Amino acid sequence: MFSLAACSNTQQNDASDSVSSEAPSQVAESTPAEGTETEGSNILIAYFTYGENAELSDDVDASSSASIQIFNGEVTGNTGVMAHMIAEASGGELFSIRTVEPYPNNYNDTVDVGETEKNNGIHPELATHIENLDQYDTIFVGFPNWWYGMPMVMYSFFDEYDFSGKTVIPFCTSGGSAFSDAVDEIKNMEPDATILDGLHIGSSSVTDAESRVSEWVQGLGLSK
């Protein structure tokens, strides 16, 4: 079961995709290769979320930003909540993607940093690293949609790891732009990985998405 502190300001998203309209849950147009077998996989859920990468105080008010969530007493973000739901449904292990340089605690400043990173092709340095990638054959990869695509830290992540022969399953949160070009970008960076159907959930719907996430994981054949 989940313990969440929901947020009241729905005008802000997990950082920003520069879209204020809310979109329903959406499955990306990527399909498994014929004969793909995922049952019994060793599963990792790697995710980047604003709330775990910002300079926030321990007593941060989650209601001050729709990008911040309190999950089981810990500060996270919308994508982090979704990652925990996937872990609960699949029995997979969680891996939080962290940057060396934290993002600002001010929402608008973070939006500006994200835009600067994208416009200048900056790949932020990673502070956390997967030490035992070989033991996993299925990797859920989650992120918010920032500026109509993946945050640039995700390019750092895919630069660092070769997922050849593994199954990669994207998931994301946003205010309305869903995956944008993220799935195509992942396919380009990991041409020898199998990319399965991804799930997008609107930022304001994340805290109520446990059943939707569980059904999706079950549909992939990855329920614990």
Regions found by a protein language model. Give the residues of each.
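Structural recognition of the beta-strand scaffold that forms the well-ordered cores
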Residues: 44-46, 94-96, 138-142, 169-172, ...
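C-terminal motif of bacterial Sec signal peptides marking the signal peptidase cleavage site
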Residues: 3-6
